[in-house]
């Protein structure tokens, strides 16, 4: 006995005082976690959407490079074309020259919330790139057997400019791919109302 109470009762009281968290502690922890999540979630969503846009631009650049390498390997003029499937724009390598998307041809399907942004009001002017004259991608880029851009009909030799952006989430800016007359691709990034910068 200790102070009129049995020893077992004292030990039991001590164990009860140490066990678990109080309801107030649990509620406060949850409240702090929810506040932190509500602050971080919009930034996380914006970052993911920015990565998606950059990824699509990189895939477009790779498809253009594949078109060029196909022209060199086949010793022929091969073109990158566009078509529409449902609500999405499709870029594809026209390997057989029939100007139609065939089942075996490499392609890039733009997500329905993205568009080819050439000529859009929020797309910065390509003159800020500092690469000289450019011409907008108008649905076709062709490469000859040397891997150079094939300007059909003796067109002006200038870099092609292909811009990609979101249809509604314009705050994420625009990405672009340029193709030099020699067939080299380069990726660009521009914030809304800003200037183009190489990636």
Where are these regions (language model features)?
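N-terminal helix-rich module
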Residues: 1-14, 18-21, 30, 35-65, ...
């Amino acid at each position: 006995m200790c102070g009129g109470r049995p020893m077992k009762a004292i030990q039991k009281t001590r164990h009860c005082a140490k066990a678990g968290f109080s309801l107030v502690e649990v509620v406060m922890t949850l409240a702090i976690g929810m506040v932190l999540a509500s602050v971080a979630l919009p930034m996380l969503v914006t970052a993911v959407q920015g990565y998606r846009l950059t990824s699509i631009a990189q895939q477009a650049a790779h498809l253009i490079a594949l078109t060029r390498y196909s022209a060199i390997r086949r010793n022929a003029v091969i073109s990158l074309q566009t078509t529409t499937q449902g609500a999405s724009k499709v870029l594809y390598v026209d390997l057989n020259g029939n100007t139609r998307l065939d089942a075996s041809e490499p392609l890039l399907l733009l997500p329905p919330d993205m568009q080819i942004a050439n000529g859009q009001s929020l797309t910065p002017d390509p003159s800020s790139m500092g690469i000289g004259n450019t011409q907008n991608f108008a649905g076709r880029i062709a490469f000859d057997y040397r891997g150079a851009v094939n300007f059909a009909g003796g067109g002006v030799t200038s870099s092609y400019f292909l811009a990609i952006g979101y249809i509604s989430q314009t705050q994420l800016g625009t990405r672009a791919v340029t193709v030099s007359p020699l067939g080299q691709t380069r990726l660009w990034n521009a914030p809304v109302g800003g200037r183009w910068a190489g990636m």
